[in-house]
Amino acid sequence: MKVDFDDLNNIFFVGIKGSGACSLACFLNSKGYCVEGVDVSDKFYTDEILSNNKISYYDNIYEFSLKQLDRSFDLIVYSSAYNKDGLQVLLEAKELNIPILSYPEALGELSRKYYSIGIAGSHGKTTTTAFLGVLFNKLGLNPNVIVGSSVKDFKDNSAIAGISNIFIVETCEYKKHFLNFSPNMLILTNVDYEHVDFFKNYEALEEAFLQYINNLKKNGILIINSDDNNLLKIKRQINRKDISIFSYGSGDLSDFQISNIAVRSEYFCFSFLGLLNVELKTVLFHNVLNFSAALLALNLFLESNGKSIFDFEEAIKRIAKNYSGIKRRVEVVKEENGVIYMDDYAHHPREIKNTLFGIKNFYKNKRIILDFMPHTFTRTKEFFADFVEVLSAADILILHNIYLSNRENFNPDELSVKLFLNIKKINKNTYFFKDVKDSINFIKSLLISGDLFITMGAGNNFILHDFL
């Protein structure tokens, strides 16, 4: 369905607490649209973002009726977490002939009038989008940005409504959602088998990424991480003579190589694109890759406008050194009584492995206490052995029942306990609490000065920080 956002005024979001839907709602709200929505009453990190943007919403999504509203709407946007034919509010909108778009469809329609830069990949797309958005914004390029989490340098918002024609957007591979998007420039961070409820094998996922590359506008630009073998394989299959392909990475196969990598205090120091001794505030090496992707994209954009990153060298170095991070990405929630409290969104075995390795390497003398909530039954089942291996690396592990997605109807109890028992065989310091809040007193009894406590996963165990 074609929609011209210039003709719209009132927009209603169904599932407004979803990370993408929330970001788009905030973006449109900042652009002057009248935005409202509905979702469940459960607490999500997006509650705070919506509140900060003064966006009102109802919390009874399954019972909600459009009759509760005192005005009509020009467009309904629904989160892809929900079935279009499964909610009363969407069925009512259809009967009333109100245009209905999924979040990725709405994003695609909105992007048509901009010079768009899409960021995708199995891991790191949120951070890379944030890096690129922060760079463009702080260098005065007035971008429009939509990120799947709140960015501290955006005043804890997940979107920026700029005045330029630049549109920087995080795009997702799940259910091929990113195929609604046709960018001028595309950054691919990596490709890893994921979303097993939709992609039946790795080849199906790979084909989706190839389709996305083919969605690039004529004479578009593709940026890939040459440290990722799967992306190198995909690169060999590209049959677009009109697009320009550039690669970044720490290995010799990259067009633009990251070098002189070192850890200094709370910074990774490196050189890239001729910029020497860039100090990036991060504890994880893969963020060096993500920042380098953003730098390369920035430089290519600047060069097309007669400039380069050397015109902004000192400013870029300041941005890297003072980068404040994003919500739920190795986020330091607080430091209290000698304990560091962190939260991270890692929910795939590769993400967990990289994050744990980075934290252990950075905080060498700290005891790592990991509280993990598996997310989705299908992911836990498919990568069961990998989860057992990577989670057992924590000094102390606390597990909870699998957090099911809205699309799943499984009973999570048996698989959750099975995961716990298999890890317990490897790491005796593994504990299981079906419900998150049941673990509060136990965690309090564990923590001593010098510990690092981190909640991890795409579930709701991050609420523990409110009680510790």
Curated annotation (Swiss-Prot):
The reaction(s) annotated as catalysed by this protein in its Swiss-Prot or TrEMBL entry are:
UDP-N-acetyl-alpha-D-muramate + L-alanine + ATP = UDP-N-acetyl-alpha-D-muramoyl-L-alanine + ADP + phosphate + H(+)
**Keywords for this protein:** ATP-binding, Cell cycle, Cell division, Cell shape, Cell wall biogenesis/degradation, Cytoplasm, Ligase, Nucleotide-binding, Peptidoglycan synthesis
What Pfam families is this protein classified in? Mur_ligase, Mur_ligase_C, Mur_ligase_M
* Pathway(s) per entry: Cell wall biogenesis; peptidoglycan biosynthesis
Biological process terms in GO annotation: cell division; cell wall organization; peptidoglycan biosynthetic process; regulation of cell shape
Indicate yes or no for the key word Kinase. no
Role:
Cell wall formation.
EC class: ligase
Source species, please?
A: Borreliella burgdorferi (strain ATCC 35210 / DSM 4680 / CIP 102532 / B31)
Q: Does the keyword Cytoplasm apply?
A: yes
Q: Which GO terms describe its molecular function?
A: ATP binding; UDP-N-acetylmuramate-L-alanine ligase activity
Query: What GO CC terms are in its UniProt record?
Result: cytoplasm
Q: Where in or outside the cell?
A: Cytoplasm
Q: What is its main location?
A: cytoplasm
Instruction: From the record, give the cysteines joined by S-S bonds.
Output: none
The identity of this protein, by name, is UDP-N-acetylmuramate--L-alanine ligase
Where along this sequence does the record place binding of ATP?
121-127
Assigned EC number: 6.3.2.8
Q: Which family does it belong to?
A: Belongs to the MurCDEF family.
Q: Which domain of life is it from?
A: Bacteria
